[in-house]
């Protein structure tokens, strides 16, 4: 067994997703840790952004029993004229018990986020050990930004390695270098998001500049040349769906052999969760024209001199 301290470390998990084949090699279990330093306008997991557990209201499941109102000690829930409910998010966000959700018999009120120990998380992950062994898969830490919570992410990676579970991480890169450096020896694979090369445009889209992100990526590629890094970009309409971005990223990645690249087309999955959290989806009804992500992929690959499967 690993250290007692590592096994008992705790953090807030909002989902454990099994049988994933898109977030690292093989069949994987993804552990989603809550909390992120970025505020991406297109985020498909808005419940991942705040670090604390949150209550969400799904009016489609509400049966109008009002047990949630009776259970709430903060008078945070009111009934609208159409029978739906409104939540005072200022009161909900400081609530420690979320009694409204526990009282709901229909899952109209649900909780995003649950405190779990490393032992509890890995007990769930290990259930699919046979699939990992046969496919070369393992556990992927995601978020949010998993390394924002080093007090749970690092013990989880160490203990997974101790239990011979292959590990990967999805990161936005906006974390202290020392944290990423400490995590790297316990990782088999890194999925590293680069959303924009221009810092001001980056700030407009996600709330912070990109200097730390690009610095961390360069250090990771340089100091850990045997660690495979897959850079990924969600291609967002009006944000990074242009050739200028693609050429700049290709130049940045030129010369590194331990890095792959994937351009991911924009999608609208997860927009309903904004309603559940009483938030507006900032992207509206925009869509990405067919072929744009493929064009970005081609430009990045050609600029950095990568050999794609099509060229072979």
UniProtKB/Swiss-Prot annotation:
<feature type="binding site">
    <location>
        <position position="92"/>
    </location>
    <ligand>
        <name>[4Fe-4S] cluster 3</name>
    </ligand>
</feature>
<protein>
    <recommendedName>
        <fullName>Isethionate sulfite-lyase activating enzyme</fullName>
        <ecNumber>1.97.1.-</ecNumber>
    </recommendedName>
</protein>
<dbReference type="InterPro" id="IPR001989">
    <property type="entry name" value="Radical_activat_CS"/>
</dbReference>
<comment type="similarity">
    <text>Belongs to the organic radical-activating enzymes family.</text>
</comment>
<feature type="domain" description="4Fe-4S ferredoxin-type 1">
    <location>
        <begin position="53"/>
        <end position="82"/>
    </location>
</feature>
<comment type="function">
    <text>Involved in an anaerobic respiration pathway that converts the sulfonate taurine (2-aminoethanesulfonate) to ammonia, acetate and sulfide. Catalyzes activation of the isethionate sulfite-lyase IslA under anaerobic conditions by generation of an organic free radical on a glycine residue, via a homolytic cleavage of S-adenosyl-L-methionine (SAM).</text>
</comment>
<dbReference type="InterPro" id="IPR012839">
    <property type="entry name" value="Organic_radical_activase"/>
</dbReference>
<feature type="binding site">
    <location>
        <position position="40"/>
    </location>
    <ligand>
        <name>[4Fe-4S] cluster 1</name>
    </ligand>
</feature>
<feature type="binding site">
    <location>
        <position position="72"/>
    </location>
    <ligand>
        <name>[4Fe-4S] cluster 3</name>
    </ligand>
</feature>
<feature type="binding site">
    <location>
        <position position="104"/>
    </location>
    <ligand>
        <name>[4Fe-4S] cluster 2</name>
    </ligand>
</feature>
<comment type="subunit">
    <text>Monomer.</text>
</comment>
<dbReference type="Pfam" id="PF13353">
    <property type="entry name" value="Fer4_12"/>
</dbReference>
<keyword id="KW-0677">Repeat</keyword>
<keyword id="KW-0560">Oxidoreductase</keyword>
<feature type="binding site">
    <location>
        <position position="100"/>
    </location>
    <ligand>
        <name>[4Fe-4S] cluster 3</name>
    </ligand>
</feature>
<comment type="pathway">
    <text>Organosulfur degradation; alkanesulfonate degradation.</text>
</comment>
<feature type="binding site">
    <location>
        <position position="68"/>
    </location>
    <ligand>
        <name>[4Fe-4S] cluster 2</name>
    </ligand>
</feature>
<dbReference type="InterPro" id="IPR007197">
    <property type="entry name" value="rSAM"/>
</dbReference>
<feature type="binding site">
    <location>
        <position position="36"/>
    </location>
    <ligand>
        <name>[4Fe-4S] cluster 1</name>
    </ligand>
</feature>
<keyword id="KW-0408">Iron</keyword>
<dbReference type="GO" id="GO:0046872">
    <property type="term" value="F:metal ion binding"/>
</dbReference>
<feature type="binding site">
    <location>
        <position position="43"/>
    </location>
    <ligand>
        <name>[4Fe-4S] cluster 1</name>
    </ligand>
</feature>
<feature type="binding site">
    <location>
        <position position="65"/>
    </location>
    <ligand>
        <name>[4Fe-4S] cluster 2</name>
    </ligand>
</feature>
<keyword id="KW-0479">Metal-binding</keyword>
<dbReference type="InterPro" id="IPR034457">
    <property type="entry name" value="Organic_radical-activating"/>
</dbReference>
<dbReference type="InterPro" id="IPR017896">
    <property type="entry name" value="4Fe4S_Fe-S-bd"/>
</dbReference>
<feature type="binding site">
    <location>
        <begin position="193"/>
        <end position="195"/>
    </location>
    <ligand>
        <name>S-adenosyl-L-methionine</name>
    </ligand>
</feature>
<dbReference type="GO" id="GO:0046306">
    <property type="term" value="P:alkanesulfonate catabolic process"/>
</dbReference>
<dbReference type="InterPro" id="IPR017900">
    <property type="entry name" value="4Fe4S_Fe_S_CS"/>
</dbReference>
<dbReference type="GO" id="GO:0016491">
    <property type="term" value="F:oxidoreductase activity"/>
</dbReference>
<feature type="binding site">
    <location>
        <position position="267"/>
    </location>
    <ligand>
        <name>S-adenosyl-L-methionine</name>
    </ligand>
</feature>
<feature type="domain" description="Radical SAM core">
    <location>
        <begin position="22"/>
        <end position="309"/>
    </location>
</feature>
<feature type="binding site">
    <location>
        <position position="144"/>
    </location>
    <ligand>
        <name>S-adenosyl-L-methionine</name>
    </ligand>
</feature>
<feature type="domain" description="4Fe-4S ferredoxin-type 2">
    <location>
        <begin position="83"/>
        <end position="115"/>
    </location>
</feature>
<dbReference type="InterPro" id="IPR013785">
    <property type="entry name" value="Aldolase_TIM"/>
</dbReference>
<feature type="binding site">
    <location>
        <position position="95"/>
    </location>
    <ligand>
        <name>[4Fe-4S] cluster 3</name>
    </ligand>
</feature>
<feature type="binding site">
    <location>
        <position position="62"/>
    </location>
    <ligand>
        <name>[4Fe-4S] cluster 2</name>
    </ligand>
</feature>
<dbReference type="GO" id="GO:0051539">
    <property type="term" value="F:4 iron, 4 sulfur cluster binding"/>
</dbReference>
<keyword id="KW-0004">4Fe-4S</keyword>
<keyword id="KW-0949">S-adenosyl-L-methionine</keyword>
<dbReference type="InterPro" id="IPR040074">
    <property type="entry name" value="BssD/PflA/YjjW"/>
</dbReference>
<feature type="binding site">
    <location>
        <begin position="42"/>
        <end position="44"/>
    </location>
    <ligand>
        <name>S-adenosyl-L-methionine</name>
    </ligand>
</feature>
């Amino acid at each position: 067994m690993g250290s007692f301290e590592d096994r008992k470390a705790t953090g807030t998990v909002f989902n454990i997703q099994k049988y994933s084949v898109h977030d690292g090699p093989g069949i994987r279990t993804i552990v989603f840790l809550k909390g992120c330093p970025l505020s991406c306008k297109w985020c498909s997991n808005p419940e991942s952004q705040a670090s604390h557990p949150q209550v969400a209201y799904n009016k489609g499941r509400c049966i109008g029993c009002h047990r949630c109102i009776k259970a709430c000690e903060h008078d945070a829930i009111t009934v609208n004229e159409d029978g739906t409910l409104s939540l005072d998010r200022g009161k909900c966000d400081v609530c420690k018990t979320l009694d409204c959700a526990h009282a709901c018999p229909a899952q109209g009120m649900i909780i995003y986020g649950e405190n779990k120990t490393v032992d509890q998380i890995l007990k769930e992950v290990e259930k699919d050990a046979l699939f990992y062994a046969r496919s070369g898969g393992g556990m992927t830490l995601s978020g949010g930004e998993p390394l924002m919570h080093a007090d749970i992410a690092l013990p989880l990676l160490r203990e997974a390695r101790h239990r011979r579970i292959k590990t990967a991480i999805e990161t936005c890169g906006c974390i202290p270098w020392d944290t990423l450096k400490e995590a790297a020896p316990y990782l088999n694979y890194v999925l590293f998001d680069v959303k924009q090369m221009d810092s001001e445009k980056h700030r407009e889209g996600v709330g912070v500049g990109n200097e730390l992100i690009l610095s961390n990526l360069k250090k990771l590629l340089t100091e850990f040349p045997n660690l495979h890094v897959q850079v990924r970009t969600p291609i967002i309409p009006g944000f990074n769906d242009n050739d200028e971005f693609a050429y700049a990223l290709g130049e940045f990645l030129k010369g590194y052999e331990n890095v792959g690249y994937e351009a991911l087309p924009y999608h609208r999955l997860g927009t309903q969760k904004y309603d559940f959290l009483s938030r507006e989806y900032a992207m509206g009804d925009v869509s990405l024209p067919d072929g744009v992500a493929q064009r970005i992929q081609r430009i990045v690959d050609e600029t950095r001199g990568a050999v794609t499967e099509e060229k072979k």
